[in-house]
Amino acid sequence: MKHFLKPFFALFLLTNLISSCNSKKEPYTVKFTSEKDTLSYVLGAMNAKTISESRTESFEKLDKEQVIKGFNANLAGTPAEACLSTLQQLFGPTYQDFNPSYLKEGSLCMGKLTGYAFYYDIRKLGALDRVNFTMVKKGFEDGLYRRDSTVIKPNSMRFIMSEFITGLNVDNGNKMLEKAKKIPGVQVFDNGIVLQTLQAGKGPNPGATDDVKVHYILTSALGDTIQSSYRGDQNGKVEPIPLSLNGGVIPGWSFAIPKMKVGGKYRIYVPWNLAYGEQQGKESLCFFVELIERGAAGSFTNPIKTNQQ
């Protein structure tokens, strides 16, 4: 993780050097001395876009210097709940209006809330030591004034962000898996899956190609709930989810579910390569699973067959 940006960072510096030598007009530049600087600048600029791209008309009216002041002042993570009512005064109860009498105070609060959210997220991800807050401030300012794209091209920014998030996902996933291995009584398999029995089932084990009905709660490596079948459908109806173990679930489930017994409750810790892989940023995941029922392939997931004449 430490050197995940090195090849790109070297290319970025070389490109900037060549372009500055070939241009007659001195371009707007920012000096980066490390990968940490580059990443921090990008993080700041991307956070500015959460303001500049969310409410285009209102954004143009904001006092940008006050937004920057609020953001910089609140990067220590000071809660700013009082600012919520101020923003309602600025934008109205439905956030469709704009009251210029609250311009200065509201702009300051916009920055404070953005700064707090940024600090909170970075701290939760365990990445405070990977960020140079001085460069975050610079990136935020440039992003707010829309000059960040002259420093780093948008595609390059997206690449840097993707690599950063993926690296954090891998690190946090590994921490989750290592912690899970130390839980008394868990089963640890060679492929990295950790299976914890919370309540032993008394029914049969599903076969490798069976259908099953389950309830489940999916959480991230940091413990955030992503999905839950217990929440029910759009009508509030809570029913077990029918799934096919033969291609209808992630590889981690195809491996772990047959090791469960109907009626049991389990927790599966799944490495990223047996979850959704690279397409979901190499996230390792945790599933609480209540195995309700099993049936032969096609019992729960195939369409109802009509009688042939």
Identify the function of each model-found stretch.
Residues M1-K31:
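Bacterial Sec-dependent N-terminal signal peptides
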Residues C21-Q309:
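Cross-family detector of peptidyl-prolyl cis-trans isomerase
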